[in-house]
Amino acid sequence: MLNTLLVVGFGGFIGAILRMLSINLVNKFFPYSISLGTLFVNILGSFIIGLLFSYAQNKGLSPLLKSFIGTGFLGSFTTFSTFSYQNLLLLQSGNYLHFALNIILNVFLCLFAAWLGFLIFK
């Protein structure tokens, strides 16, 4: 159990740092009212989780590695709480079009990315 906690913690450490760097970099080059940085990390994370579970299902993967990537790294790399907060700000500012667009883009593109990732090892 301690090994799993340490592995998840280390994965979370790496994922959180990469999320911060990725969001800042993408938003620097694409400064829109919708955070494309948040959209980017959520799409990429969804694609990776599709890959991970497809690979684990078809080829096998150690529980520790699955915990490191799935729970640790991806749990901190992707961000539903930031997505929720950003949507709340869009709603409060009366920017209803961007609010709806942000939700639609995140939900559909993330599901599509997870599906594509899953297909690779199927």
Predicted regions mapped to residue ranges:
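Membrane-interface helix-loop junctions in multi-pass transporters/channels
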Residues: M1-K122
